[in-house]
């Protein structure tokens, strides 16, 4: 063992050993408990960022800890390689997406290896290869044959800049989440998978996910959006077909004064065809896409269609308005409006001079006032004919029953969740394996003709997908007849919805090898960002149920435990140029002056300009405040970067990047290295004789085993990695001060250092590997995690505080099993206590076992 800790040489040597020994390559082993740990795989953007490093360090710490628990641990890695950034980069760099992607994969793979992550590289794959997406294509055709896939023309969010469809959740403030272009509505044929058929199960099974954060489960519950209500029919004057409406408040039915319909509703389109002004309004509504969350605050706009609906129970005519707050893809695209009891309806009615008829009053019988605002609470019905006096649930049931009896409605369950639109009008994605013959019939591509391969040698013009532009590519045959291929590609969430399962058998000649998949699945620990709560994590749960129902897996859920790591923040600085726009300056190019409290007083960039500090914000390219992990590894070593990442903040909270903190982690690791080196250069140690230890030695050993117990719980159960490291640091402070004079002192230090080195191993595997060897042990990668000695935690002696009239006057060292009488006798005869009791009469003596002797005297 070298005297100086030199991470660069050490880490490369140990990484080569792991590669050569295939340390982390695993196979199924029925004799061992398995543990499958997975971090969300990266998009090969070109370079790792600190968010990646944090995610993958957490996963590696969990994996290495579980391996030392004796489990058969699989930790795979791969590449989420399809997607729009590759197309944009290809246009910018005048290349094709494929070579750009593969070059990035090679570069990032080397970066991951330099950080010492214990991946089973034999399972690596990239989702953009036909060997991967071929099985996705075949599974899609199986879903089609089962009736779970369909194609329909639908109104979609269209980004005119990226020339692609966006999911609702990819629309932010009416603009594309990627390029900030205003989103338009466009009708195009789309492929859908029927996730709605699994909505109830997806909702119910959230209750089985005890290892998931409550916040993620709540977000999914809200996204699925189950509600119980009534679907009812309003007849429409002059129309054969009734207008179907869904409501969760049938108790307010007698207060309906108009019906609102979406701009895309067939009735709206029919009326707009005869009314140019209405047509212009519906077009405006279509192209002003709003997220559901914004409906409450947006300005309510509408226009009378001229059509009249007939109230299903009292026969009253009410106007039908096209309203900008009614969504076509929720419920039926039509709402019954009750202005007196719904604030949105109230604002609309007030604006357009429509009737406001209250029919619900508070349960205490007091009058309801709707002169300024709607009364939205549940209460008791009035002015509702035969339903007067009924409370909410009774009214709900009675009105639903009457509607059903008259054939005008029924109770129903509705979900906010829509079927999953998987078509994308992009090139760099997996081709959808469907063809259309000349008679207009659509067919899945037969399995023996899969994969439908995406051509990689293409030229990108930034506008049209090469497979759409190349008319020859689409030409094919089906059963000997001419046919055209589908030129849309899959939403890239398709690939990431089942990759976790493919890792179990990446070479299988099917989507999965059921035997291997059922050994490894479900994933025991999944690590990734909370931004994926409603898309990737929901789609993966859905895909797992599809795989189960196809007979590939037996489990119901893909991920047992989920850890959502916090973001990595960094200081951001900007300079305002002559045009008044902000130029973001990299923190590494800024010199900082701080006040006594550590706050930034002044910041100057490398050109001598004073720059403004914008605070600690998420690392991003746009703010130029990212820190290159490569530079940090080159400067401090991978172990130091890993240790800082795990120590600086709880794993699920934001982490503030401070180079001073990295320097602190480096100093600590050097102190551990120094103590191990000093200890090992003194030669071998004799066996530890626990029975012969002195009081001080027992106390130190107790600290060692308390630390083992705490670190084991913090990493294994609580996942508070930062407090585990803090406990090891605290122990190291004691070990640095511990005497080394006697043979038993050295034997005790030997036991303690071995425990410290193994406890640090998940965070700092390279340094621990070398120190473990120096301590005379072999291969830390396969050693056992230290177990704490319960006997060592038992204290032989206890310190009892003596209080006289509420003030600390003495401390007693007593045997751990001393009786109350013995403690009282010692306390009342203690030399210090006697001084303060001189001349006083003892009135009361109270003993708190093992802690305190309280004497009251006057």
Swiss-Prot record:
EC nos: 6.1.1.4
Protein known as: Leucine--tRNA ligase
GO biological process terms held by the UniProt record: leucyl-tRNA aminoacylation
Family: Belongs to the class-I aminoacyl-tRNA synthetase family.
HAMAP family: Leu_tRNA_synth_B
Compartment(s) where it occurs, according to its Swiss-Prot or TrEMBL record: Cytoplasm
Motif 'KMSKS' region: chain residues: 618-622
GO annotations of cellular component type: cytosol
Molecular-function GO term, any one: ATP binding
Database matches in NCBIfam families: leuS_bact
Main location: cytoplasm
Keywords recorded for this protein, A-Z: Aminoacyl-tRNA synthetase, ATP-binding, Cytoplasm, Ligase, Nucleotide-binding, Protein biosynthesis
Motif 'HIGH' region: chain residues: 42-52
